Amino acid sequence: MTSNRVMIVTSATEDSLQSVLDAIAGAGGGEIGHYTHCSFTVAGSGTFKPGVGADPHVGIVGEINRVPEFRIETFCGRDQAKGMVQAIRAAHPYEEPVIYLIPLLDEHDL
């Protein structure tokens, strides 16, 4: 069983959400049949503590920060995943955006 599809999960602040979504779509993510720009977004909060040498987009170095963020879930072909990660990093304001790549089962593998 080899997965040809990958779920991509990342997060973005409200001010960067549309830029990240546009980058995902521009790299070919979120396409199902005749539909494009497919994703799921939910509001939540991100927690982090920037260390010495960090230059956070939001938050204060040396303090635990909690900021409103939006979790983004979308998908792409396995062969598109590297380009998708590059597109997200280019559009994302964070120094170290969290990006999860999760192989997906195809219904024919069941």
Tell where the protein language model's regions lie, with residue ranges.
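Hydrophobic structural segments
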Residues: 1-110
